[in-house]
Amino acid sequence: MTIAEIQQEILRMKKEQDVCILAHAYQGQEILEVADYMGDSYGLSVQASKSKCSGVIMCGVRFMAETCKILSPDKKVWLPNPAAGCPMAEQLDLEGLRTLKAEYPDYTVVAYINTTSELKTECDVCVTSSSAVEICSHLENDKILFIPDPNLGRYVAEQLPEKNFAFYKGGCPRHIVVSAKDVEKARADHPDALLLVHPECRQEVVEISTSISPLIKSTIIFSSSRFSI
């Protein structure tokens, strides 16, 4: 079967089985074309909770499907590839979290949404990259243990100097390989492009970015027609 034929079959079965298809923005074009909703992990889970469909197919990784199920407990949630995992979400296990909590007993544990459901059960609050600063600013406790991404955690800490942060030594393997030298090369190659950076990148990269707002939102906010991401 061709890609187009497979897509048509997916659309037919989707309607027949009363499911909606959620696709993370990182998915390939052939997946995005059959999806009902495209976005980030939390945004997709919210869309699933609002959907009238009885089931959801999450085209993403395991923690995304888990988050979807948490927000839509009455819906059936399928993960097309059960082996699809997020290295950052899986680098800290429950035993490791309990060890950290023992080291920082007076700290409020803030978990990035990119964590397993198992870890979420023993954390105090869960945040997204766009909500982390606001939520942490309203915590009564000034001591915050941020897991699992130290880069996002440090970005939040810089916005909230009145808080005392501790971090887990983790990070996204894809984002941490981007260096300041890579950024300078991109700027040299595309001098008229605005630089958009995700806060999971290293501090040296975040500091020289044009924007760290949600990437898709940034392309709408700024008038530029060229972006380096």
Task: Give, region by region, the residue ranges found by the protein language model.
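Active-site loop-to-helix "anion-binding N-cap" substructures in soluble metabolic enzymes
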Residues: 1-222, 226-229
